[in-house]
A protein has these predicted regions:
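A short acidic, Gly/Pro-enriched loop at the edge of an enzyme's catalytic core
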Residues: 109-121
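Conserved class I S-adenosyl-L-methionine
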Residues: 2-50, 61-65, 85-88, 107, 149-176, ...
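Class I SAM-dependent methyltransferase SAM/SAH-binding core
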Residues: 51-111, 135
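A short SAM/SAH-binding and catalytic strip from SAM-dependent methyltransferases
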Residues: 119-133, 156
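A short glycine-rich, Lys/Arg-flanked "PGG" loop and its adjoining helix->strand segment in the class I
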Residues: 134-149
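Conserved Class I S-adenosyl-L-methionine
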Residues: 4-17, 32-33, 59-61, 183-288
Length: 288
């Protein structure tokens, strides 16, 4: 296993939030992590023997499907800041006998890896956490080999609505200082916004497609699993125990009253192919 790289401040913040969320990450109510990770990989048409880098890999939602696709002759490297999520990913890989996937703790925005070393670079629901999204996308492009693909997947607008608004209205009622009117992913919720991000990173001819989606819960109470197993967790953990219970009761009560068990989960899939004529990046020999 490779050496861990030091984490930047944004990566440490993500580690705190998603490390805590790991205890709920594999609940059935959060099946969207695996579903959209697999959907991202399926769009790449990975060939057996390919090398794949999965940045902000979490519990393996996209790295594991990639490992299945490339087979034992290929190689997949997943990098994430949250050690507890990586532990989940390693356990899942071991259960499937996927010995050709490695999970490494580190800052996805500064891996220290040589340029052009991967047939595909993937980042699912992670690019918007970088302090400079365009710089992060450009770094991922640097790591993509000639003829390789860079896949970025982001959330579409209205994520988890109508439950999202119920949650934040409840937080504002209990502890106004923690109310958030804006989330990092709100900047790139359309196909055009994602294409613009590729362009700002110096990547030409990228494609992006918005796909509407719905996520169904067994009952409204299961939304609290999503709260504890996603980015909401940072807000919940900042509440006192009493406040946390007040927010939970408000959220669940309102969702039950409105019989809400279907959430909006629109997704935007972006891809770009690095021209075969592109020069190899420094530190990597030309491919044969």
């Amino acid at each position: 296993m490779g050496a861990e790289q030091p984490l930047g401040e944004h990566a440490r913040r993500a580690e705190r939030t998603y490390g805590a969320a790991a205890d709920h990450y594999r609940r059935a109510s959060l099946s969207f992590w695996d579903r959209f990770g697999a959907a991202t990989v399926s769009r790449l048409g990975l060939a057996p023997g390919s090398t794949v880098l999965d940045l902000c890999c979490g519990a393996g939602g996209s790295a594991l499907p990639a490992a299945r696709a490339v087979g034992p002759g290929g190689n997949v490297l997943g990098i994430d800041a949250a050690a507890s999520l990586l532990d989940l990913a390693r356990a899942r890989a071991a259960d499937e006998g996927l010995a050709h996937v490695e999970f490494r703790r580190g800052d996805a925005t500064r891996t220290g890896l040589p340029g052009g070393g991967f047939d595909a670079v993937v980042c699912v629901f992670g690019v918007f956490f970088a302090p400079d999204m365009a710089a992060f996308a450009a770094e991922m492009w640097r790591l993509t080999g000639a003829g390789g693909m860079l896949a970025l997947t982001t959330w579409g607008p209205g994520l988890f609505e109508p439950a999202n608004s119920v949650f934040w209205d409840s937080v504002r009622a209990v502890e106004p200082s923690l109310f958030k009117a804006f989330n990092p992913w709100d900047e790139i919720t359309t196909a055009q916004a994602l294409r613009d991000l590729y362009s700002r990173a110096g990547i030409a001819d990228a494609t992006a497609v918005a796909v509407p989606g719905r996520h169904h819960l067994d009952d409204p109470d299961r939304f609290w699993d999503i709260v504890l197993g996603s980015g909401y967790r940072a807000t919940v953990d900042a509440l006192s125990g009493a406040q946390r219970e007040q927010v939970r009761e408000r959220v669940i009560g309102r969702l039950r009253a409105r019989k809400i068990a279907t959430l909006r989960t629109d997704v935007v899939f972006g891809t770009a192919v690095r021209p075969v004529s592109a020069r190899p990046q420094p530190g990597l020999a030309a491919r044969t």
